[in-house]
């Protein structure tokens, strides 16, 4: 469904259902969404959201056998009508203050995001990813969906993360890699005993990948020691279509507590006067590349503040 929306030239707006009714209503209204696709279990929430917005919104229940028949007869089946600079994805950042910001990403952005995953993780067509992250998040959508699609490999798509089933899925489907967040790493450390883990066939796995927030070096080392699987710390944002930095794959040496080096884009560290700082000097992490967002939707002021020439300010501090 998500791929079909983008292929047809429409723009998808993924919704985080745990964001709450008020925030979801704001996103639907602000984005000007015309259609909501909903599962049966979330249909009541979808109806409440539609009641709160002024724009007309069609509701389609997607897990009904006849949901396609309910689409208006005027809907047209299209060939590929997209250009690489066209808008494909409008994803809202949660943000810690104020209203969420809508990030406009083009077809070029999301394909380049997938390419950056492929390059940094040396993905081949025989790789298989385990996706346990939600697709309303840039990590889940770009890293574990677009990465495999661009590299012509495959993925196992889970409804949600389950610490109980995680390693079982990897064993059953011979997954070669996975992308998670630090809270999932901690959950796996606490869930499995060494004996439970050793009883599974995990011979296919190449590495695990951590992103979305900093991974504590102690947790990182404990995971690798217990499970004997290399964990690659990375960094990315919604605005950068996920990956910016990544540690290299084994046998190359990783640096604990660091998100790594650029793959597929350029990174510099600037001071408050927009000058590049010397080595080992803390400054603002700025990135440039084909994966960088087009703009914040309906927010030209924030868009302008976020760029200096071709460099995007990530809002994070770092050093080289």
Positions of the model-derived regions?
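Hydrophobic alpha-helical segments in the ANL/AMP-binding
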Residues: 1-15, 24-25, 117-119, 138-151, ...
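Short beta-strand->loop structural element characteristic of the AMP-binding/adenylate-forming
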Residues: 2, 6-37, 101-104, 131, ...
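Conserved AMP-binding A3 loop
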Residues: 88-112
């Amino acid at each position: 469904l998500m791929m079909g929306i983008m292929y047809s030239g429409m723009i998808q707006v993924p919704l985080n259902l745990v964001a709450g009714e008020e925030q979801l209503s704001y996103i639907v209204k602000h984005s000007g969404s015309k259609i909501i696709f909903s599962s049966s279990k979330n249909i009541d929430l979808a109806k409440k959201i539609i009641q709160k917005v002024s724009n007309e919104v069609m509701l389609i229940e997607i897990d009904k056998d006849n949901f396609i028949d309910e689409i208006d007869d005027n809907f047209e089946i299209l060939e590929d009508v997209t250009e690489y600079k066209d808008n494909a994805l409008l994803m809202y950042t949660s943000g810690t203050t104020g209203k969420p910001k809508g990030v406009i990403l083009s077809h070029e952005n999301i394909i380049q995001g997938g390419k950056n995953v492929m390059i940094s993780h040396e993905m081949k067509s025989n790789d298989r990813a385990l996706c346990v992250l939600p697709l309303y998040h840039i990590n889940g959508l770009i890293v574990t969906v677009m990465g495999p699609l661009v590299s012509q490999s495959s993925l196992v798509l889970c409804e949600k993360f389950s610490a109980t089933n995680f390693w079982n899925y990897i064993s059953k489907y011979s997954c070669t890699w996975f992308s998670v967040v630090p809270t999932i790493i901690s959950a796996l450390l606490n869930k499995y005993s060494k004996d439970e883990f050793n009883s599974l066939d995990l011979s296919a796995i190449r590495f695990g990948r951590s992103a979305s927030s900093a991974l504590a070096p102690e947790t990182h080392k404990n995971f690798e020691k217990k499970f004997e699987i290399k964990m690659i710390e990375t960094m990315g944002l919604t605005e950068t279509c996920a990956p910016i930095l990544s540690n290299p794959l084994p046998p190359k040496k990783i640096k604990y507590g660091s998100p790594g080096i650029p793959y597929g884009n350029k990174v510099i560290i600037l001071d408050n006067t927009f000058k590049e700082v010397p080595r080992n000097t803390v400054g603002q992490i700025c990135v440039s590349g084909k994966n960088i967002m087009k703009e914040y939707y309906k927010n030209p002021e924030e868009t302008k503040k976020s760029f200096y020439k071709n460099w995007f300010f990530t809002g994070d501090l770092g050093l080289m």
